[in-house]
A protein has these predicted regions:
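Acyl-donor (CoA/ACP) binding surface of acyl/acetyltransferases
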Residues: 1-49, 88-200
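Generic structural signal for secondary-structure transition and capping sites
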Residues: 50-51, 76-79, 142
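Conserved GNAT-fold acetyl-CoA-binding loop/helix
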Residues: 52-73
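Short, hydrophobic secondary-structure boundary micro-motifs
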Residues: 53-55, 83, 197-198
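Short gly/ser-rich anion-binding loops that grip negatively charged ligand groups
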Residues: 57, 61, 81-82, 89
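A short helix-loop-beta-strand connector motif used in the catalytic cores of GNAT acetyltransferases and
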Residues: 73-87
Length: 200
């Protein structure tokens, strides 16, 4: 399960309410919120260990039933303004990737987990996707802090996170849904750091 960032920020009541509203209102042509129609496609993608093995917070075992529950749970959290599970579709309308934004509105903070279908990995689109997701969390959701983790041996994700300008802050224990833990690399970035890095 996700844990809020190590660095503690306190949102004002107005900021917290705005973040919750932004999460609840997200979606549209450019951002497809996962629904029942995506269960089979997500299951097929996540059943591939090349996709799912590095990700600690996926439902296990990966079955259509567990993925359907995960989508339902994510939607319930979206209605509270605390989570957003989205899918990327390819030209044929098949699930090509997913992103799950976990949001702590009271902390003005968020994290993202996600993956691309195995046949689309190493296509150099990962860094662009990370940049889009960062912009979305800061500009659309309105959080002031993003925290990210990656498995110690997940070289590809670590390289993308480093390249995006996140600060490495050591290691943390990530807790899986079954209660077991995984040692993870840990990064943070503030909105101010992102603005400085990306100012034209």
């Amino acid at each position: 399960m996700s844990a809020p960032p190590v660095t503690v920020l306190q949102a004002t009541p107005q900021e917290e309410a705005a973040i919750r509203a932004a999460v609840r209102g997200a979606g549209g042509d450019d951002l497809v919120v996962a629904g029942p129609q995506h269960v089979a496609g997500l299951t097929a993608m996540l059943a591939d260990p090349r996709v799912s093995d590095p990700i600690y917070d996926l439902p296990r075992p990966i079955t259509e039933e567990s993925v359907a529950r995960w989508i339902e749970q994510s939607e319930a959290l979206r209605q509270k303004g605390e989570c957003l599970l989205t899918v990327a579709l390819d030209e044929a309308g098949e699930v090509a990737g997913y992103s799950r934004f976990t949001v702590w509105p009271e902390r003005s903070a968020a994290e993202i987990a996600g993956a691309r279908r195995a046949d689309l990995q190493n296509s150099h689109a990962g860094k662009a996707g990370v940049a889009r997701s960062i912009a979305f969390m800061f500009e659309v959701l309105g959080v002031r802090m993003i925290a990210l983790t990656a498995a110690l041996d997940n070289v590809r994700s670590a390289a993308s996170i480093d390249a995006a300008g996140f600060r490495r802050m050591g290691e943390v224990d990530s807790v899986r849904p079954d209660g077991t833990t995984r040692r993870s690399l840990y990064w943070e970035m503030t909105r101010e750091e992102w603005v400085r890095t990306h100012r034209l």
